[in-house]
Amino acid sequence: NDLTYLLIIILTRLDYFPYTEQEKDPKFWNKWAQRTLTNALTLQSLNKNEAKNLILFLGDGMGVPTVTAARILKGQLNGQSGEETQLEMDKFPFVSLAKTYNTNAQVPDSAGTATAYLCGVKANEGTVGVSAAAVRTQCNTMHGNEVTSILRWAKDAGKSVGIVTTTRVNHATPSAAYAHSVDRDWYSDNEMPADALKDGCKDIARQLFENIPNIDVIMGGGRKYMFPKNKSDVEYPGVAKHSGTRKDGRNLVQEWTDRMKDKKGYYVWNKKQLIFCTVPSVISGLFEPADLPYDLERNSETDPSLTEMVEVAIKILRKNHRGFYLLVEGGRIDHGHHEGKAKMALHEAVEMDRAIGRADLMTSTHDTMTIVTADHSHVFNFGGYTVRGNTIFGLAPMLSDVDQKSFTAIIYGNGPGYKLVNGARENVSTVDIHKNNYQAQAAVPLSMETHGGEDVAVFAKGPLAHLLHGVHEQNYIPHVMAYAACIGQNKEHCMSRSGSAGLRPVLSSIVALLTVTRLLC
């Protein structure tokens, strides 16, 4: 409101900053830097162990500005000014950048990028699990151009595998882990054109249960795509938009349940069932007909948080002595940005960071490689010379020198937040900019905000995490993970690599022992 804004202006002019007294002393910063340097020097001893477990946290749309803003929000939620806060991903020792473009797009979409960081090859926008030789919507270009994912490589190596997402389980990001489709929007056969069905292309929901039939953990939304058309939803009976969509009449959930009886598999559709079930060997949890709600709108009694899903997933997957691969997507960061709802997006990012922290408590860097990255960025940013501790959702402490009006610190390059009132820019000082659904100001009017094209950060820790350095193509990521775990096409080096996975030291010892024994004889 106007009073709050006036107070900000006054405090700014008084050169007020909510820093502590110790920050005025150079010793504070020197001590902090020396401590950081000491920690950095320990990284000279590289972790060359074999990665028994692999975890990929994917923040959909979580560009670097989103990471920074989420860091500030996390601190402010804990009563701090925010800038000095550390996200869990900030603690990872190795950081690199990934170039996100698709083969046919400078600014990418989530399907082509998912194919890159899961399957190891760049692809066209809108396609999943196929090479760039496949053309979007053209079914006849798919056959023979399928590519497999690291989830498949891990499964073939005897590891347990899982997918956890806050979107539909057949959405762009998770689908690239198991599906091959020339259109990311073919969620069920209801969304597919007749000629594609005739040519033998399969919908993505069907592929979830058929292509890799023994995925150990499946959690997210997308329930309606698994049931016959017009079948009433178990949670929202009688609500047409939540009813089943499948034209083929198949009940994929029932088929999965029948197939998993011998494995004692559990199908769950609400939080209570998830939390209180005994830890099964296999689980499929579909908690909403479509995407899960934003964390700020989530009913904590019925829908699990991303952190809760990750905890259950790891409890199940770690029972396999050969290890596991887990894909975790904070998928609704992207949705919040598209809608211009920065508060929704940033709270989603903070929740994903909580999930990263929970996974860290349940695993060890000795044998678990964890990577945190994004598929792409957004045209989201914040600025305006805000003072230290300024609420991340607040106003900049200055008026525009063009129209003499306030503006929000958070700004989108385009999107639905572009608003005119009587032909002039909206006076945001009279608007409740802190409500959850507030659409932050945008420079160009669009019904949906767009992706950004800049590089995204890749945070890594665990065995061979140092291989993620510098600037790389996005498709490099699964190759590093596979190399660390000795799966897929990266196996030969495992016989000679030093560390717990390397067998050369062991073989050398055996040869030496045999030589000594022969001499003694």
Regions found by a protein language model. Give the residues of each.
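Outer membrane beta-barrel
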Residues: V161-N170
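His/Cys-centered metal/cofactor-coordination and adjacent catalytic loops
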Residues: G129-G144
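Structural beta-sheet core signal
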Residues: L56-F57, I163, V372
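C-terminal GPI-anchoring signal of eukaryotic secretory precursors
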Residues: E492-S509
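Cleavable N-terminal signal peptides of Sec/SRP-targeted secreted and luminal proteins
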Residues: N1-D15, L507-L520
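Substrate-binding/charge-relay-adjacent region of secreted/lumenal peptidase catalytic domains
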Residues: N104, P108, C119-V128
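A post-motif C-terminal structural segment
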Residues: E21-L37, N47-K52, M62-T68, I72-T115, ...
